Amino acid sequence: VPHGKPNILVIWGDDIGISNLSCYSDGLMGYRTPNIDRIADEGVRFTDYYGEQSCTAGRAAFICGQNPARTGLTKVGLPGAELGLLPEDPTIATALKAHGYATGQFGKNHLGDRDEHLPTMHGFDEFFGNLYHLNAEEEPELEDYPQPEDFPNFRQNFGPRGVLHTWANADGTQRIEDTGPLTRMRMETVDEEFLDAAAVFIKDKAESATPFFVWFNTTHMHFRTHVKPASKGQAGRWQSDYHDTMIDHDLHVGQILALLDELGLAEDTIVFYSTDNGPHMNSWPDAGMTPFRGEKNTNWEGGYRVPALVRWPGRIPARTVLNGIVSHNDWFTTLLAAAGVDDIAAQLKAGTELNGTTYKVHLDGHNQLPYLTGETDASPRNFFFYVNDDGDLTAVRYDNWKMVFLEQRVRGTMQVWAEPFTELRVPKIFNLRTDPYERADFTSNTYWDWMLDHAFLLVPAQAFVAQMLASFLEFPPRQEAATFGIKQALDKLRAGLPSA
């Protein structure tokens, strides 16, 4: 590495299911993703990798390195919402910038609607992207969307902002340029705009021999998918717009990998590919696919398990499959370790200065670098906490075992988002090695007998959760999770808060 620090390129799709990548499903879906597969061929593919249950939570978990219950960013961010990334929470970009990196984010953000939430207020030098999920962006084009003559300030107060291009200023402020709305037509090719901007950023840093951290977040494959005319039908007959656009998404990944090759940066760059959460299957056929139970916004594996691939030539062995538990939380510590900072978690826990600001936070991630490089054969993470979008702990995994405390009993459709979780008086137990798809409780004649035999796990599980959550006493949630209902607004009115 010429400057002693690897470049870091993080590529994320949106709501992409494990089955949608042919390195996982081997053509089962009727098309292939050779460019994304290349990352797996030249690096590591994970089988037990955890995102979060929805867009905002997954992105916050990655960039902040904290369980979303700490940041309060568990609920999908909507236009006009007040909740977003707070200045007290550092990001990977904040830390890498303090250690000499140029930082750029391109594509979907979804970490807050307001100026203070934008990436260029949270460690990024440059941002060009949109702020929400695609279906929210196209709402103003609906025939019955509120019009100015009836609701004069509705669009301004509650509608989506445009695609923003922003730059961080040296004095801590930012410059913001609104490039216009993300219309249905623009959705067909907006990822190409983001890719072009990311390419310019990478080329510029390559010319100046500056290490870079780039987070390239495509808008695809979130629903609703708008495929450009030239791509329609390219997945083959009897396929779908979703599959046609997955091929475009794969081509975009191929283009940015080819750029690294062209610039001679491939050997010096960590490339990490993933997505935010499990697929939103209730919008099928405009939806991702997973073999796991459930989907986005549930407590089941299908809501949390996501594809994940990472490549670092010469450091990470090629064609490796890892079965250990790894999560989005782990990349803050892992990427800083790769950049030569092995103790970032300890520094932040004690309180440390980054770019002139002192931060004191509890990182929930583990340094996975020795596991990735083959120095150790086991992941340092042996557990995962499943937090839903209300900020509640619905389940915990420890090694093989998963205990479900709250379950979503709706099988699918948007009822998954509307119906409450059911609190179980006795938690359900699953063995995620013998029953990885969590089907035993509704397919096995002997499940309840088996569970009764394993009731010895329940009290230790409670003790484990209490032990792991003890850090919340010193580092409590930064803000209360948002809600789609009216309870928070009513509570604020009763308290006399002006933001109500």
Where are these regions (language model features)?
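Formylglycine-dependent sulfatase
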Residues: 1-427, 432, 436-500
